[in-house]
Amino acid sequence: MNPIDSPAWRALAAHAEAIRPLHLRDLFATDPQRFELFSLHHDGLLLDYSKQRVSVETMALLRAYAETADVTGWRRRMLDGESINHTEGRAVRHMSLRAGDQAPAEVRAALARQQAFCESIHNGVWRGFSGERITDVVNIGIGGSDLGPRMAALALSARQQPDIAVHFIANVDSADIAPLLASLNPRTTLFIVASKTFTTLETLTNARTARDWLLATAGQESAIARHFVAISTNLELTKQFGIADDNVFEFWDWVGGRFSIWSAIGLSLALAIGWKNFEQLQAGARAMDRHFIDTPADENLPLTLALLSLWNTNFLGASTEAMLPYSQSLHLFPAYLQQLEMESNGKQIDRDGKPLNIATSPVIWGESGTNGQHSFYQLFHQGGHLIPADFVALREADFPLPGHHASLLANCLAQSAALAFGQTAEEVRAAGIPEALIPYKVFPGNQPSNTLLLPSLDPYTLGQLLALFEHKVFCLGVLWNLNAFDQWGVELGKQLAGQLTPLIEGNGDLSAFDSSTRGLITALKG
């Protein structure tokens, strides 16, 4: 059913008309206990959503809609292994990758292989063609085969393993790979080629360049076996590349790319932080899985985040959502969320193949604090756009230095308060500001936000954080009645690029293309 046909949806739309004129200043003034009422605690995490433009009635109506949309039923279908990714006929089982002792036998066996491989690198058992230890690992992948491990390796850089440096290559632009190769020693470098099908254009182009670079020094094709491993399901193509079957780590079609950090795609991360830390990452995610499955709606963190996003997007009219981590270690978390949220839910066709005719995923963007304050926060405060935000902060610093962390936290809390409450003309006037400047000093406020406090940034809490947002994305897909686990929107551009590449490299008939594309190709060829 289209969401807008639901009585629960219509009740929310009517309620929004009553809520929209209210200011967060008024909501806090009428309820001094608002923080206690609109905050959730779980396993060291604190979610403060009191600065959202909601009331008790709002949350009750949102939860009623979640019941109508059958979030609980769809969650059960996912856990039971039903093919809820119906357009591809696939189950969605990424949670089983981090299920620990309860994981399927095939998952436990795959993880044991990954652990043994990681330990062979860290212990110096695995060596390059020259007999030297591996000192550098390069992950070659793109999208879900890059964003998750890259983000997490930076987030957990305080736990970087000694004597191993892990690098990431994604873009087909030679400016990505060429400078890195120039800095590395082919005798001590290992490449991980991450591509489920082993046909991804960007990944295979970079992998071939890396292979040529290695062979220019090694001379013998046999060296590939000591310097390349693959994460793929296509043994035929990995073998053609020169990678032995024993050096291929499998994963399954029920693992979507943007949910794959828990699989062999996380191999580069495990090499960066060590296997015990990787297990703690999985443990944190597993704990969040249990919370999501077992906790009632009114205390459920992922569902609450999803409902607030739905409210802001579909009933208050927001078209974007900002992720603002006040942690430089989480600098890449907004980029990771861009794929997780927008590739999952950026769709206009429902599960029945019919147009939705409502907004779905907001545009996700952001920057680490305090950097963003000196670039785009001006727009937040006085730009006239409704921009809901998620602030993420750590109670304890990754790298404690006197004076740094208190200032960072103060800025985080100050920005969330300033966005919520603003500054009135009367307050500006009372501060003695010249009358002519008063309009420029007014801050409208009423910008909704969440603040998520983590005790620290360690593998366990990062696992919690990633699983929290994975489950938020799942809930939103159900609430919008769409399939969050396919991504047909990425296909057309790839098909056209395949047609255009030979035309740019050589000559060919351009008549099938539009005048803009023809003109640009002609200009590129000089």
Curated annotation (Swiss-Prot):
Pfam families in UniProt: PGI
Active-site residue list: 343 (proton donor), 374, 494
EC number assigned by the record: 5.3.1.9
Keyword Cytoplasm: yes
The protein's annotated pathway: Carbohydrate biosynthesis; gluconeogenesis; Carbohydrate degradation; glycolysis; D-glyceraldehyde 3-phosphate and glycerone phosphate from D-glucose: step 2/4
UniProt GO MF annotations: carbohydrate derivative binding; glucose-6-phosphate isomerase activity; monosaccharide binding
GO biological process, one term: glucose 6-phosphate metabolic process
Primary location recorded for the protein, binned into one broad class: cytoplasm
Protein name: Glucose-6-phosphate isomerase
